[in-house]
């Protein structure tokens, strides 16, 4: 079954947008994944195609109505057999581990909010998982949805040209990615580190690991704090590996 993302939005014309070019775009054109953008207004019941109303209790802005959004969700995912997400700054932070889980499934239904937000009752009634891509606020969920979809698509079979390209990137091993270099060998007096030109794969791997660890310690202490537990588990598992028995 082809991985497929369905997006509920007030602006379906925003899609595929950046997802239609480069790596994701080529994969989309090749049928390695699918995308459907549905207009929430199609589920409105009045002649004005109204989808929002004023906040209960007062306050600025407008709120997406639960009845309209529920109808939109039910129209495309009545069986509720895949993840249902809503992009929200108050949601759980999106991690590479969660991206891998989503990429391994059938593809999510993603709700993109606008205005002041979404009626909480539809979030509860339809089991929407609130997901955040960062501690900041966007005008709507569409750009956040594109980021999530792009992160998933690059993990799908056949999308990346080389398997190691995805497994060596930031977060795939709990570390930020090491620095990358290419020609020219010297740029404005700054040379490529000699070890990368040595041809010694062991030394190159050790250098890259050291750089990744140093960057993670300095820039993401939260990731580094979780690293020792992963290392201890890995060592424990290696110690449990049975030794080869000799005949006789």
From Swiss-Prot:
Biased composition (Basic and acidic residues): 234-248
Catalytic reactions of this protein: guanosine(37) in tRNA + S-adenosyl-L-methionine = N(1)-methylguanosine(37) in tRNA + S-adenosyl-L-homocysteine + H(+)
GO biological process, one term: tRNA N1-guanine methylation
Domain of life: Bacteria
Location of the protein in the cell: Cytoplasm
Role summary: Specifically methylates guanosine-37 in various tRNAs.
Name of the protein in question: tRNA (guanine-N(1)-)-methyltransferase
Organism the protein comes from: Rhodopseudomonas palustris (strain ATCC BAA-98 / CGA009)
Gene from which the chain derives: trmD
